[in-house]
UniProtKB/Swiss-Prot annotation:
InterPro entries per the UniProt record, alphabetical: NusB-like_sf, NusB_fam, NusB_RsmB_TIM44
UniProt keyword annotation of Transmembrane helix present: no
Organism: Chlorobium phaeovibrioides (strain DSM 265 / 1930)
HAMAP family per record: NusB (MF_00073)
GO cellular-component term (any): cytosol
Family note: Belongs to the NusB family.
Gene this chain is encoded by: nusB
Protein name, as recorded: Transcription antitermination protein NusB
Ranges of Basic and acidic residues composition bias in the record: 149-164
GO biological process: DNA-templated transcription termination; transcription antitermination
GO molecular function terms attached to this record: RNA binding
Region annotated Disordered, chain positions: 144-164
Amino acid sequence: MKTYRRQIREKILQALYTLELRDTDIDSAAGWLLTPEILADPKAMKFFNLLLGNIKEHMEEIDRYIAAHTFNWDMSRIAIIDKNILRMAMAELLYCDDIPPKVSINEAIEIAKKFSSTDKSSKFVNGILDAIFNALKEEGKINKNGRGLIDHTPPRAAKTDAKS
């Protein structure tokens, strides 16, 4: 049976949530959540390990990006689920070269709709990720290849210039 990346993202989100609430390490938290279906699928495990590894390895950097774009929010005030959805999407944007940015952002929004406690969470996640993505794109920090290539539409300023 084919496992889908969203299921894996949801398991990673649950592991990150567990990590915030329990005295455990991320690998143990993630291990409890893996289904036999995911464990039996080499591609699923590769994606799981890649995404989880990038979140673990780059958590401080990811948190700095989030903090820089949540102007009126201290990281400790962001709901645990929302913060971890942002972390996961940021790890995909920055370190998963084959995933298009729009997919990462859309997946984060859909997961926020499913797991967050308020209707506003998906809008919050969307706004923060959109702002971070645009900043990263302008800074040339989004490096995608293969299926992950970003569309090559001109920046917003260039679009308005083209209309004149």
